[in-house]
């Protein structure tokens, strides 16, 4: 697993945003009610929907409550779990300073964990994977947009079974 600095993440995000521009509308948009609950099943379903990836990434782009290092989040149990996970994986920079999480093919459990954190903490995040230029967006507005790949029909069925709904 690697964490990319802000300037590297910005370059990678521009590349991904161009891919989004190629496909104006997502293939599927799902909604959910956020809150302090268990997102592990949804995160595992999203990760499994990628299939056999060579490289997968999640980029934090925004969160209403900040990046977990501000004063308001300092006492948050959920943000504390994320900071502890991040430190345990060798990253001590703030999330704003190193927002891009990259995973190799054997790190699907770690990818699933960071997707779970993104859902739980209400991030705007880009999830992408290779091969196949797979692309999914998570939104703090309780929305998941599937643009490309992710076995999107099957993933939608699983997420709907977990209480998510289409628009």
Across the structure, where does each feature detected by a protein language model lie?
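Structured alpha/beta or helical-core interaction and ligand-binding surfaces enriched in interleaved
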Residues: 1-167
């Amino acid at each position: 697993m690697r964490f990319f600095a802000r300037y590297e993440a910005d370059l990678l995000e521009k590349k991904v945003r161009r891919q989004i521009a190629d496909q104006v509308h997502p293939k599927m948009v799902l909604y959910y009610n956020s809150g302090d609950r268990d997102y592990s099943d949804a995160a595992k379903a999203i990760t499994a929907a990628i299939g056999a990836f060579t490289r997968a990434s999640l980029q934090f782009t925004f969160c209403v409550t900040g990046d977990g290092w501000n004063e308001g989040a300092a006492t948050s149990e959920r943000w504390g779990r994320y900071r502890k996970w991040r430190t345990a994986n060798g990253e001590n920079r703030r999330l704003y300073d190193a927002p891009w999480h990259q995973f190799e093919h054997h790190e699907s459990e770690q990818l699933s964990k960071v997707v779970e954190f993104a859902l739980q903490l209400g991030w705007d995040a880009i999830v992408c994977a290779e091969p196949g230029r797979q692309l999914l967006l998570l939104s703090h507005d309780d929305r998941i947009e599937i643009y490309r790949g992710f076995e999107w029909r099957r993933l939608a069925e699983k997420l709907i079974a977990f209480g998510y709904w289409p628009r």
